[in-house]
Amino acid sequence: MSSYFWAQNESNRPDLLCGQPADYLVEEKHFTTLVCFIVVLGGLLKMCLKNCEVIVLTILSLSGFVIGHMAYNSVEVHQIVYPLLRTSSFSLYSYFSPLIIFMVALDVEFYTLKKMFWQVLLTGLISFSTASIIIGYVVIKFNKDSWDLQSCLLFSITLGIIDPLRSVNSLKTIGISKIYIDLIRGESLIICSIASIFFGNFRGNRIHFSIFRDLHVGIELSYDILGSIIFGYWCAKIIQCILADVFSNMLTNIILCFSMVYMTFYIVEFLGMSGTLALAAVGLNLDSLTFKPKIELVITKFLRIFSSVYEHLIYAFFGIVIGCGELSHYEFHTIPFIFILFTTVNLVRLLTILLVSPILMHSNYEYNWRWGVVITWSGIKGVFNLLWAPDVYNLAERKVEVPQMFILYVQVISLLTMGINSYVMTQSARKLDLCVLSLPRQMILQNATQHIQEIVQNTITLFKTEKILTNVNWTLVEDKTRIEYIPFSHVSHNDMKTESTTDEALMEEARLHVAAIQMSSFEKQRNNGILEIEAARILIGAAKCYYSIQGKFMSIYDVSTYMRTRSWLIKFKNVLTFLEYCIEKIHFIPPESNTFLTFIFHIVFSEEFEYTGQIINLIYIYPMIIHLWPMARGLNVSALISINYYFMFLYVLESTLKIIILKRKYFQQCWNTLEFFILVIGIIDIFCVYFVKLRPDNLALIQLTVIMGYLRIIRFLPLFKIIVPILIRIADVQIKKRLSLMYSITKGYIKSQEDAKLLIKQIAVCESIYQKLCEILETNKQDAVKELVLMEHEGRDVVIALKTKQAIRNVIAKALKNLTFLCSRGIIDKHEVIEINKVLLKKLKALNNFPKAIPPPTPDIYLHNIIWLEGKDVLIDFFKERAKLACFDSGDTICKGGEMPQGIYLIISGMAILHSLSPTFGIESNQRCDRGSRDMFTEFCTTGDIIGELSCLLKREIEYTVICETSLQACFISLEDLYEGFDAFWPSLEYKIWLKLALSTAYQYFESSLIDEDLRFQNCVMFNQAYVETLSSYSDMIIDNMTMKFVIIVYGSVIDTKTEEPYFAPCIIPTTCEQVQGTSDLSKLLIIQASELTQRNSNTNVMASVNTVFEQPGKNINGRQKMS
C-alpha cells in the first residue's frame, strides 16, 4: 500500500481517472478557480434548496458532467480539469475521507457501541458478506460489459458499503432512538473499515484469488486490524493530552486536532494498515469530555462545514470524470442495469436485516419488526462508495474499455438511495409510530410548556413593577408571549386521546429523564472543575449503560466497579506487607564476659550483613546460568561442584549466626523459614551429587540429582525481598489513586442526585410519581453518603488532599472570574490580563502534581476549621485552653435524644450515625396541625462535622441520637466553656453561630431558590449580605421588599399581622407579607438583602480595594490588619 501511495507509476505518464491524456503544455492555475466555483455553487444551492440535499448533489453531479463533456470537446476546459484527471484515486480518498470518518466516529456513542459491540460487529460482517456475494453474482449475471471476476468482486464490495454520513441523517430529525442511529453508524463504520482493509491489500500487494488460500494473508489482516486499532487508540490519548493543557487556546487546539486526524491517517497508511479503521478508533475514544465546551462546539461546526464542502466537491468531481468519457459508451442497457442494481441493493439489505433480527431482538427489548422495516431502508450509499469506485478499474486484473462506468453506476445508485431510501425510511418510521412521542413523554412536554409559561408570566409581573416600563402596553405583551402549545413534528395528537397510561409507563419516562439530568450534571461538574475527567467519564458511561435497562435507577453500587479493584489492591498490599522483611532487634543483653555473642549480635543486626546476603544471591546468578547450559556444564563440572560447596558454606554460616542470636524467633519470620528450606534443599543436593559419584550407574539417583540441581533456582527467591518495598509503594500509590477516583465519583453522584431532585417537579406529571422519585433519589443519595463517609474514614489523608486540591481550584477559579470582571470594566489592560492569567493557569496546572495524600492535622488545628471562629487567634486560643479530647469506641453513644446537651463535639477522626425524627424547628406539635407523624431519617457524621450546636444555643433537649460507627475522636467543648465564650465575646460569637446555622438550614431546604446568591459565611459577615433577626413571642418586624430580597424563617414560627396566616420554619415568607409577628418563644429569621444593595456593598469593597491597590497598596494592608 505504501508503495502505491508514494511511488510514481512506472511509465512516464501517470494513470488518469478518465479521459484522454494531454498532448499540450498544462497550466494548473485555473483548477483552483474550478474548485472555488463548485464550493460557491454548492453553498448557493444548499441555501436555496434547504432540506433537499439529494437535489443539490444531483445538480452538482449534472454540472460536473456538463463540465466534463465540455472538457472532452474543448482543449481550454480540458486544461482546467486535467489536474483532477491525473490525480490518483487513492489521493482523492486520502484528501476527503479522513475528516468525514473522524466526524462520524466522533458522533457515535461509544458506550452504546461498547454495550452492543458483538451485535454491531456481526451485523457489519453479515451485511458485508451478503452484499459482496449477491451483488457480485447479479453483476456477473446481468452486466453486458466484459468485467472479470475480480472487477465484479471489487464492484460488489464498493456498492455494498453503507455511507455512515447519509445513512442516519434523515432519522436524526424525527425523534428516532439514538440507540438505532448508533447501531446503523457502527455497522457502516465496520463495513467501511473492512472495505478499506480489502482495498488496501489489493492496492498494496496486487494479490490474486489464489493467494487468499495462504496463511500470510490471515496474518496481514490481523496486523491491519489490530495495528490500526492500537495506533488509533494511542493517537486518541495524544489528542486528549493536547486538549487537556490549560495553556492551549482554541485556535491551537483546533489546528492540532485537524492535523492529528490527517497525520494519523497518513502514518497508518504508510505503515501498510487501515487509516479508516485507525480514525474510527480515534473518534470512538474521544467524547464530549475531551473537549472544552466552546472548543467542542467550534470543532463540530468545522467538521460539518468541511464534510459538506467535501461532499459537494466529490459529487462534482466524479460528475466531471464521467463527462470526460465518450457518450457512445452509454447504451440503453445501462438504465435497466442501474435499476437492477438498485433493487438488488435493497433486497440485500432486507436479507441482512432478516438474518440479524434474532441477534438484535435478543440484545434490545425495544427491537421488533417495525424497527426492522425502518433499518432495511438505511442502506444508503454516498461519498465512500464514490471514493472507492475508481479503484475497481485500477485494481482489476483485466482493464476494461470504459472505466467511468464503474463510477457512473455507483454515483447514480447513491443518488437514488439518498432520495428514495431516505424518504421511504422517514415515512415508514412515521407510519409505524416509531418517532411518535409516548403519552408520558407528551405529558412531560406539556408540563414543561406550562412551566415555561409560568416563568414568562412571572417575568411580566416583575417588569410591571419597574417605573421605567409603566407606559408599556402589557396587554399586547401578554398576548404576544402567550404559549398555548409548542408544536413538535413527531407528536401524535390522536394518541393523546386514545392511549391509556399507567404509573409504570410514567415512572419509566421519568427514569429516563432522571438519567439525562444526571448525565448533564456530570458534564456540568466536569466543566466547572468539580469532577476529574476520568470520574466524569466513568459516571457518564455507567449512566448510559443503565439507561437502556427498563426500570433501573443507577445507584452508587452500580458505578463502584473500581471498588473491587481497590479491594484487590488492598489485599495485594497486605500480602506484600506480610512478606516485607524487617529487622526487629530482640531484647538481648549479652553477658559482659561473652564478647563473642556481643560481636555476633552486632553483625546480625547490621545493614552490611543484609547487603552481603543479597550480594551472595546476585553473584550466584552466573554459576546458575552455567549449570543450566548443558554444554558449559559439561566443561565445568568440578568447578561448579566446588562453587556449590562454597555458596552452601556461606548459606550455612548466615543461618547459623541468625539462629545463635534469634533462637526460636528465627522461624517466626517467613524469609528466615525460606532460607532454612533453601539450606536443607542445598544439603540434600550435595549428598545427591556425592552419592552419584559413588553409584554412577543408578539411573533413579541421577534423575533425582538433576531435579535437585534445577531446584537451585529457589536460591534466588530471597532477592524478592529487595522488590517487596518497591511493590508496596507502587500498590499504595495505586490504592490512593483508586480511592481518590472513587471519592470523586461518589461526590459527583451525590451532586447529580441533588440536581435531579431539584428538577423532578417538572419530570413528574403526578404527585404519586413525584413521591416515588423523591424516595428513590433520597435512598440512592443516602447510600452514596454512607459510602463517602466510609471512604473518608478509610483514607483520611487521601480525602484531605482531594478537598484541599478542590479548595485551591475553587479559589483560582474565583480569581479568574474576578480578573475577567476587572478587565471588562477597563481597570486592567488586556496585556496585563494575559500575564496575570498565565500566572493563575500555571498554578492551576501545578495541581496535576498535587500530592495524593496529606497527613491529617492535629486536633488543635481543627479548631481553625470551625467557621464561626473565623480563624481568629483570640477565639481559637480561648477554646484551645478549654477543649478536651474525647475518644469513643465503635458502638458507643455520643449523645442521646431527650437528654440535655453537655457541650459540642468537633469530630477529628472516625464516623458516627445520627438517628432522628424530622426536626421540630422549635414548633410545638399543637401549633402545627398539618404536621402528622414525623419521619425517621439517618445522617452520617465524619471528620470536621460538629454535633450539638443548636441544642447548646437553646439549652434544650437533644432531638437526635448519635452512635459511633467506628472508633472516633472528637474535640469536646463543654456547655459551660461555650457560654463563657459567649460572655467573653458578646454578642458576636453567639450571633455568628446562629448565622451559620441559619445559612445551612436555608441552603438545605431552599437551594434551588438561592442558587444565584453568594451566601458564603465570610461575605455575610463582611458585607452584611445576609443577617439574622430574632423575634420573641408577640414581637413584630416590618418587611421591606425594596431592601429585603428573601426573608426565611429558619427557627420558630411567625404570623402575617395583616392576614394572620401562620408561617412555620423552615419557610420563605412571601413578598406579599409586609409585617410579621413571632408566635414562638424564640424565632429566627434569615434576611437576605436585595441584589442592588448587596451589589453596591460588594462593588464598594471591590472598587475600594482596587483603588487602594493602585494608589496605596501598603496602606491597604495595614488597614486590613487593623480591621482584623
From Swiss-Prot:
Residues carrying covalently attached carbohydrate according to the record: N447, N473
Pfam families attached to this UniProt entry: cNMP_binding, Na_H_Exchanger
Cell location: Membrane
Region (Ion transport-like): 642-723
Transmembrane regions listed in the UniProt entry: 25-45, 52-72, 90-110, 120-140, 179-199, 224-244, 254-274, 305-325, 335-355, 372-392, 405-425, 612-632, 641-661, 674-694, 706-726
GO CC annotations on file: plasma membrane
Gene3D superfamilies associated with the record: Jelly Rolls, Voltage-gated potassium channels. Chain C
SUPFAM superfamilies for this protein: cAMP-binding domain-like
Main location class: membrane
Residues noted as binding a nucleoside 3',5'-cyclic phosphate in the record, renumbered to the chain: 867-999
Function: Involved in pH regulation.
Comment block on domains: Contains an ion transport-like region is related to the membrane segments of voltage-gated ion channels.
Family affiliation: Belongs to the monovalent cation:proton antiporter 1 (CPA1) transporter (TC 2.A.36) family.
Protein name per Swiss-Prot or TrEMBL: Sodium/hydrogen exchanger 11
Lineage: Eukaryota, Metazoa, Chordata, Craniata, Vertebrata
